[in-house]
Amino acid sequence: MSKIKISDLAKEFGMTWKELAGEIEELTGKTVKSPSTKIDEEIVSLLRDVLQPAEEVEEAVEKKVEKEKGYRIFELSHDWNIPFEELAEDLKAIGYTKSIDNFTILDEETVNRLKDYIKEKKEKEKEKKKEEKEEKKVKVEKKVEEKPVEVKKEEKKEEKVEKVEKKEEKVQKKPEKKEVKRKEKIVAKEEKPERKKAVEEKPKKKEVKEVKKVEKPKVEVVEEKEETKIKIPEAEIRKETKEEKAELEALRKLMGPQPKKKKKKKKKKEEEKAPVETKEKEEELKIAIIPEVVTVRELSDILDMPVNEIMAELLKRGILATVNQTIDPEIALQIAEEHGYLAEIQKEGEEVKIVEELPQEEKKKLLGEEEEEEENLVERPPVVTVMGHVDHGKTTLLDTIRKTDVAAKEKGGITQHIGAYKIKLSNGKEITFLDTPGHEAFTTLRARGSKVADIAVLVVAADDGVKPQTVEAINHAKSAGVPIIVAINKIDKPGADPERVKRELAQYELIPEEWGGDTIMVPVSAKTGQNVEELLENILLVSEILELKANPNRPAIGTIIESKLDPKRGPVATVLIENGTLHQGDYFVAGFTWGKVRAMFDERGRQVKEATPGTPVEVLGFNEVPQAGDKFVVKPSEREARLLAEQRKQKYEEELQAKRTRIHLENLKDVKEINIILKADVQGSLEAITKSIEELSEKFEDVTINIIHSGIGAITESDVMLAAASNALIIGFNVRPDASARKAAEEEDVDIKIYGIIYDLIDDLEKALKGMLTPKEREVLLGICEVKQIFRIKGVGTVAGCMVTEGVIRRNAKARLVRDGVVIYDGEITSLKRFKEDVKEVAKGYECGLMLKDFNDIKPGDQIEAYEIVQEKAE
């Protein structure tokens, strides 16, 4: 007796083997566990008698499907031109609680409820759009009154609106026709013999179409689309084989509703083209001003459209662009108009103007210096600049106030850079201090410090009296209109004579209060802290009299106090906020530079998110190193900041080029020239040295010193090659040449001079110009070692564990510690060991331990250069 596999039998009945196994268990009580199980012929016969043949099952299923197919969600989505997601939301809105997917079948009652809900929703949307349209028309009319040229364009658009509204009345009848079509489709499927009849009725509709075509040609597109849709049920009504059904089902699951929707939209665009789109655009009419230079992202913001949509519009035009790439303004104009905007192109010059060329009132407004309303102002900390002669104790005084040891880090105790610090007193009051360099070379920095300060503290040593730089500081403070408080320092020293200082200051119209004048003079000792509290109280007193206020709720403006190029963080600047609040992420312009605030740090190196008026912060995010003293102004966009900076720079370069051309044409044959390449550690030092060299050049009529290049950071190979090409001398201030630069200098025979004190630099240059150089000292590099590890030994100090990478390291040799190309220390090696033994020298490739004289701030990665000074005859 032959047996049949249950899997084969399941195919015959159009069932899965598990479903068939269930039927067998119900009829016979036998359990089937595998699709390969074979069934006796008797059971097969019983199943064939009991179960309906597969073909009949198929017909029944087909009838059921055909009867209910019109109510599947994906069909409704397709025919009603409503996205599946929107239909699903509408179903939830009418209280449909079952799970929803593309093939969910809805009963007739649910479909009717859904249809009524959608119709009601569309009516509400239509009313809302009409109201919005009226509001927009009013706005456009106002715009037209301002711009008469656009009246014709507006009239044309109004005519289009009327035409489209007429057409809309006909298009709105579409859902009813679709419903008739749906009913015809259901009847056609229930009564299969009448299919041909339904097809034969089509020509009647075509006749109607032709009559309408004579009256209103535009209706033809709509009617043809309806006729095209009637063919859909004809294609679907045909009987499908099981394989075709399976393929169709799989295809539908894969495709989902989205591809159909896209295809439909595309077809709709091709058939209907502009008319319906015009209606939508007219209803959403907006104004857009397109800048002459615009990026994809900026256009996205202007049109309030996603970036990917803008990029898609560009792709349609064959343009592949990134988000930050600029695009043709005409293309941007086309995109704007296609999305319902009245758009025009605005020229660059209409938006961004060079501040220096503006009238005074407009310039103040652009720089944020216009008068603020009283109700917006709040009290701000006073900004105090500390001024005075060299070594009169300015930095030591600040150290006493801040309880920090900044002076120990300065070269020879002389302040080389402006520092800015905000301190909080015990009474909760805050004061911002500027530590301005006191010696003559820093005149420009000191002048700059006076301008940003509210109060000047003039430090005069009680044992030294008034000096030339003291007088200069007085003049700067007076010219800036800054009140002066005199701190007579070093009263603890033998020979201190505060009364003598008062007499000398009286000659410069600084009369002490006890003599009937209005200048506050406080005798202090920065070393012991005597009377420092009294000095701070007087600063706060003057601050109250000045009524210092600012508006923290506006974009920030400030001044660049100091700037430098950090090897790891890029261009960095200390900014003193004078008005407004600076936030992380703000766009700004400062002189020729611009950028975005990437990060901010306070005077203690802590990161902050915002900076209020009177606060100094270190700002990261400049496109290049700004000039100290430049005005720092926050701008609303990157584009505006960038354009303003570029225009300023271009104007400056044009003026500079014209100036250089005049100098060369008039004096090139008549003067001797010395070309110099100048590199320094910070911007302030660079400016001070440049000014000193210019003053030196003026003393010698027959010699001109040209600084052909200057910059911040280590001396590089490109600097050496420039010097070789222009026969120039390289001068480094607190910076060193890197390895490639040293090698190139030897090969090209380029002279590199390194200095740590400005006086020495200027003195050497002056002697060279006079031809009076005495037998000079020359530096000879002995070797270089890299710090690998540090050891802190109690009572001894810091020992640096090093690897010698070049030459030899000798005990008692002079040593220079270089960190990121900047000289941190210059002294000598006091101890040199290999393991535990003292040695005289350590050669390349060996490890050693060494100590530096009076210096413990050594870090792994630092380079220590050992060198010696040899005497040479002057050439």
Curated annotation (Swiss-Prot):
Keywords: Cytoplasm, GTP-binding, Initiation factor, Nucleotide-binding, Protein biosynthesis
Region of interest (G1), ranges: 388-395
Ranges where the tr-type G domain occurs: 379-547
Region of interest: G2: 413-417
Cellular compartments annotated: Cytoplasm
GO molecular function, one term: GTPase activity
One Pfam family per UniProt: EF-G_D2
Keyword presence, Cytoplasm: yes
Biased segments, Basic and acidic residues type: 240-252, 269-278
Region (Disordered): 123-204, 240-278
InterPro entries: EF-G-like_DII (IPR053905), EFTu-like_2 (IPR004161), IF2_II (IPR044145), IF2_N (IPR006847), P-loop_NTPase (IPR027417), Small_GTP-bd (IPR005225), T_Tr_GTP-bd_dom (IPR000795), TF_IF2_bacterial-like (IPR000178)
Broad class of the protein's primary localization: cytoplasm
NCBIfam families: IF-2 (TIGR00487), small_GTP (TIGR00231)
Name the record gives this protein: Translation initiation factor IF-2
Species the sequence originates in: Persephonella marina (strain DSM 14350 / EX-H1)
Lineage: Bacteria, Pseudomonadati, Aquificota, Aquificia, Aquificales
